[in-house]
Design a protein with these regions (language model features):
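A short, exposed loop/beta-hairpin motif centered on an aromatic-Gly-Thr core
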Residues: 23-32
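Short aromatic-glycine-(Arg/Gly/Cys) micro-motifs in beta-strand/loop hairpins
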Residues: 7-22
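Short, charged, surface-exposed hinge/linker loops at domain edges
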Residues: 1-4, 37-70
Length: 70
C-alpha cells in the first residue's frame, strides 16, 4: 500500500509529516527523514488498529498538492 504524505517544516525547524488520507496520522522529527520514519510508524499503527477492530481501510484518495505563488 502506498500513501501520500505532506511534510512541512515549522517555525522552530521541526519537520511535521502527515498523511491526509488517514486522519490523525501525524508525526514529527528533527530531520525530514526522521519525520518520514515516524509517520510511517504512525501509519502502520493506524492500519493495525483498523484491522484489529475490523474497521475498513479508507480508500485511496487521489490527491495532488500544488504549490502556487501569491
Amino acid at each position: 500500500m502506498k500513501v501520500r504524505i505532506l511534510i512541512e517544516q515549522d517555525e522552530d525547524g521541526i519537520f511535521v509529516a502527515e498523511c491526509p488520507s488517514l486522519p490523525g496520522c501525524v508525526s514529527q522529527g528533527n530531520t525530514r527523514n526522521e519525520a518520514i520514519r515516524n509517520v510511517q510508524d504512525a501509519i502502520r499503527g493506524y492500519l493495525e488498529s483498523l484491522k484489529k477492530h475490523d474497521e475498513p481501510i479508507p480508500p485511496s484518495i487521489d490527491e495532488e498538492i500544488v504549490e502556487i505563488a501569491l
